[in-house]
């Protein structure tokens, strides 16, 4: 008798959460696996959809965040249906959090891959990524949407090598009544000149950012990354368009592609549709050429996670041993105090007590953080606070955030006498800096660090003075245009 083997029917692919799933608690529909990182306005987790077995990404957003911006992001994602844009599946309210369920891209962002491998991309790899990215931008721009934050950190790759646009926390919708925007939103080094100048911009602002991203993928960082961001804000609109540090290393086609992206006049800048016909993009190879670098990056990430887990396990063991030592009331002393007993202390060395430890634990025990990097500011996703004060340009908030981080990092450090008040030190009129020779290296380094806030203040004063002169001219031009239209 012939036996018939029964095969399990294949699970359907998740396209959108149905009404039944959306009425349940999210834990009934998904199993959360691990934290991936921080996104705009919230944390991002890897999860599995129980019914289909499909892996998804879930952004958990505290409701005290700017709900208007969150709703805008969801609205934009809901309207998009492209293989080159991260898909949106549905949303839940859970306690004080909003859960946004999105497509999962297992390879992470392009910037993550560059960091993990400690290696920049080849022209072939860049061309393949740019081709998919341009298709995503062509789709968005056709839908009258501006991404406004194109960079390697917001281009995600799935494990097959397909690139998708992500992080719509600052994306905008162009309407018939407002053909251009005049708000400064985005990441400073990638911003187009017209965005910085606040003279209004449209979809081709994303093309400038794409050109900067192409340089970032080739060289590991965007132009001006080595200088203070506030200086970059002034240099981008006034300097000629940036290019490669060593142009001779790159082909004519690649150099020309970047040149067409980085045209300062928006009216003369190429569109996404035009750039898809550029020889550099048209000759791009298939996504299979990205699989080696993806596998290499994922191997590095796995090894780092395993190393972090080993550190946690080791710390747990040390903690356990310390607990055993501290469990008794009395501990035998060592050294000169042989034969005496004293109470064991569990306080740290810096606790200003008269009792010393038998064993000193590290001041900060290692904690495992999934997918954490040292360079958080360039990570795949990050929380943006620019909507907290709508009247303030976002790049200024970027600098303020940096200043807060610097203050936190330097908290508690004593400042040498000559550096306590930066205003006490004046630049010598005669240019005689001999007195600096008597300062220690530490004093000199702290003096150097103190110059940055002074420079930011001076630059801001210059910016305000420049704006006060520039605005009346712009107002006069606008008034003349209106009068001409009336005639």
From Swiss-Prot:
Which ranges form a coiled coil? 290-310
- Regulation of activity: Inhibited by the C-terminal non-catalytic region. Activated by caspase-cleavage. Full activation also requires homodimerization and autophosphorylation of Thr-183. Activated by RASSF1 which acts by preventing its dephosphorylation.
What reaction gets catalysed by this protein?
L-seryl-[protein] + ATP = O-phospho-L-seryl-[protein] + ADP + H(+); L-threonyl-[protein] + ATP = O-phospho-L-threonyl-[protein] + ADP + H(+)
List every position bearing Phosphotyrosine.
433
Q: Which residue numbers mark the site Cleavage?
A: 326-327, 349-350
Q: What gene does the UniProt entry assign to this protein?
A: STK4
Q: How does it assemble?
A: Homodimer; mediated via the coiled-coil region. Interacts with NORE1, which inhibits autoactivation. Interacts with and stabilizes SAV1. Interacts with RASSF1. Interacts with FOXO3. Interacts with RASSF2 (via SARAH domain). Interacts with AR, PKB/AKT1, TNNI3 and SIRT1. Interacts with DLG5 (via PDZ domain 3). Interacts with MARK3 and SCRIB in the presence of DLG5.
SMART domains assigned: S_TKc
* Purpose: Stress-activated, pro-apoptotic kinase which, following caspase-cleavage, enters the nucleus and induces chromatin condensation followed by internucleosomal DNA fragmentation. Key component of the Hippo signaling pathway which plays a pivotal role in organ size control and tumor suppression by restricting proliferation and promoting apoptosis.
Protein name, per record: Serine/threonine-protein kinase 4
Q: A Pfam family in this protein? A: Pkinase
EC numbers listed for it are 2.7.11.1
Q: Which InterPro entries match?
A: Kinase-like_dom_sf, Mst1_2_SARAH_domain, p53_tetramer_sf, Prot_kinase_dom, Protein_kinase_ATP_BS, SARAH_dom, STE20/SPS1-PAK
Please give the family membership noted in the entry: Belongs to the protein kinase superfamily. STE Ser/Thr protein kinase family. STE20 subfamily.
Write out the residues that bind ATP. 36-44, 59
Q: Which GO terms describe its molecular function?
A: ATP binding; magnesium ion binding; protein homodimerization activity; protein serine kinase activity; protein serine/threonine kinase activity; RNA polymerase II-specific DNA-binding transcription factor binding
The residues responsible for catalysis, as annotated, are: 149 (proton acceptor)
Residues annotated as carrying N-acetylmethionine in the record are 1
Q: Where is this gene product found?
A: Cytoplasm; Nucleus
Gene Ontology CC terms, in alphabetical order: cytoplasm; cytosol; nuclear body; nucleus; protein-containing complex
Tell me where in this chain the PTM Phosphothreonine is found.
3, 183, 340, 367, 387
Q: How is it modified after translation?
A: Autophosphorylated on serine and threonine residues. Phosphorylation at Thr-387 by PKB/AKT1, leads to inhibition of its: kinase activity, nuclear translocation and autophosphorylation at Thr-183. It also diminishes its cleavage by caspases and its ability to phosphorylate FOXO3.
* Key words, A-Z: Acetylation, Apoptosis, ATP-binding, Coiled coil, Cytoplasm, Kinase, Magnesium, Metal-binding, Nucleotide-binding, Nucleus, Phosphoprotein, Serine/threonine-protein kinase, Transferase
Modification sites for Phosphoserine: 265, 320, 410, 414
Quick one: where's region Disordered? Answer: 305-337
The SARAH domain sits at 433-480
Enumerate composition-biased segments (Acidic residues): 313-326
């Amino acid at each position: 008798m012939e036996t018939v083997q029964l095969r399990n029917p294949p699970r359907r692919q998740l396209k959108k959460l149905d009404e039944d799933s959306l009425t349940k608690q999210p834990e009934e529909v998904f199993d959360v696996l691990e934290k991936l990182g921080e996104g705009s306005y919230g944390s991002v987790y890897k999860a599995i959809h129980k019914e289909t077995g499909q892996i998804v990404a879930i952004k958990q957003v505290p409701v005290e965040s700017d709900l208007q911006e969150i709703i805008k992001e969801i609205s934009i994602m809901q309207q998009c249906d492209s293989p080159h844009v991260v898909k949106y599946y549905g949303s839940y309210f859970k306690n004080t959090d909003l859960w946004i369920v999105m497509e999962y891209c297992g390879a992470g962002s392009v910037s993550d891959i560059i960091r993990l491998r400690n290696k920049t991309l080849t022209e072939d790899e860049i061309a393949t990524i740019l081709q998919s990215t341009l298709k995503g931008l062509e789709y968005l721009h056709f839908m009258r949407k501006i991404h406004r934050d194109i960079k390697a950190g917001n281009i995600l790759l799935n494990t097959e090598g397909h690139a998708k646009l992500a992080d719509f926390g600052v994306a905008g919708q162009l309407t018939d009544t407002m053909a251009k925007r005049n708000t400064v939103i985005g990441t400073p080094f990638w911003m187009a000149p017209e965005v910085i100048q606040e003279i209004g911009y449209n979809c081709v602002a994303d093309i400038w950012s794409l050109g900067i991203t192409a340089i970032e993928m080739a060289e590991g960082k965007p132009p001006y990354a080595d200088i203070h961001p506030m200086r970059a804000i002034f240099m981008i609109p006034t300097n000629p368009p940036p290019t490669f540090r060593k142009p001779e290393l790159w082909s004519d086609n690649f150099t020309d592609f970047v040149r067409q992206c980085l045209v300062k006049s928006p009216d003369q800048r190429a569109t996404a549709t035009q750039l898809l016909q550029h020889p550099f993009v048209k000759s791009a190879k298939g996504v299979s050429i990205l699989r080696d670098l993806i596998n290499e990056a994922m191997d590095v990430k796995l090894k780092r996670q395993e190393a972090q887990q080993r550190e946690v396990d080791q710390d747990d063991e040390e903690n356990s041993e310390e607990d055993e030592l501290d469990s008794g009331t009395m501990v035998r002393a060592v050294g000169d105090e042989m034969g005496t007993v004293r109470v064991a202390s569990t306080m740290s060395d810096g606790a200003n007590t008269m009792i010393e430890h038998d064993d000193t634990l590290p001041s900060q025990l290692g904690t495992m953080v999934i997918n954490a990097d040292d360079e958080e500011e360039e990570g795949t996703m990050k929380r943006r606070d620019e909507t907290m004060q709508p009247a303030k340009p976002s790049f200024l908030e970027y600098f303020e955030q940096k200043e807060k981080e610097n203050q936190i990092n330097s908290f508690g450090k004593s400042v040498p006498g000559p550096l306590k008040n930066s205003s006490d030190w004046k630049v010598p009129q005669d240019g005689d800096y001999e007195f600096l020779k008597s300062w220690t290296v530490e004093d000199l380094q702290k003096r150097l660090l103190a110059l940055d806030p002074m420079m930011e203040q001076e630059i801001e004063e210059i910016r305000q003075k420049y704006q006060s002169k520039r605005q009346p001219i712009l107002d006069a031009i606008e008034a003349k245009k209106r009068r001409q239209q009336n005639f």
